[in-house]
Amino acid sequence: MSGGVIRGPAGSNDCRIYVGNLPPDIRTKDVEDVFYKYGAIRDIDLKNRRGGPPFAFVEFEDPRDAEDAVYARDGYDYDGYRLRVEFPRSGRGMGRGGFGGGGGGGGGGGGGGGGAPRGRYGPPSRRSEYRVIVSGLPPSGSWQDLKDHMREAGDVCYADVFRDGTGVVEFVRKEDMTYAVRKLDNTKFRSHEGETAYIRVKVDGPRSPSYGRSRSRSRSRSRSRSRSNNRSRSYSPRRSRGSPQYSPRHSRSRSRS
């Protein structure tokens, strides 16, 4: 297999992530399928080292999407290979150096060389006053599930969920918040585990009781999810309002999510 490159303009290290411990037969399109749902991709550089597992660099348009991808995909089981996903160690204050280790195949860990601290990457940190409260979420609904669902209304800059089945979502623009209440209230929500529920969406008041509660499932990163469960996740790509989206092709028979 030869590595493939999808080229785009250069960007910040905050937008670029390292993906290690890939299977030997991985293709650029396969890497794309794993990461496209987290945001617009600018560049995928897939490399195949002689005597070692392939690795790739994926560059997003938005650094918040890169954080989402690291949080959600580090440790992800891909055809028996546990992916190692982190920011390049020359960026984000990690110092300079190579990527030690890389892990073995067949579910071996991505050990060696360290990496970003576990649990560092939670919901995106950018905040907005254009906030809605969502209620009626199923127990397995995560902040990423909620963010994906609400992207149907526009650009989401923050999302989180709480133990009582409520969540908070913040939009970049006021009109997106208004559209979300009008179009997504009482719609069917589907979690990454396939649980469905009809949710209610309303504009957050100045003293919302749900905002700021302690989190539980929003921060947990499950490493035991099956690929079939991940395939069931319903993703809605962000509406294009600026730069063109990186448009994946989904004609392969082995579609991975």
From Swiss-Prot:
GO terms classed as biological process: alternative mRNA splicing, via spliceosome
Composition bias, Gly residues: 94-117
S-S bonds: none
Gene Ontology MF annotations: mRNA binding
Compartments it resides in: Nucleus
Keywords: mRNA processing, mRNA splicing, Nucleus, Repeat, RNA-binding
Gene3D superfamilies hit by this protein: 3.30.70.330
One Pfam entry name: RRM_1
Region of interest (Disordered), residue spans: 94-126, 202-257
Protein name per Swiss-Prot or TrEMBL: Serine/arginine-rich splicing factor 1A
Lineage: Eukaryota, Metazoa, Chordata, Craniata, Vertebrata
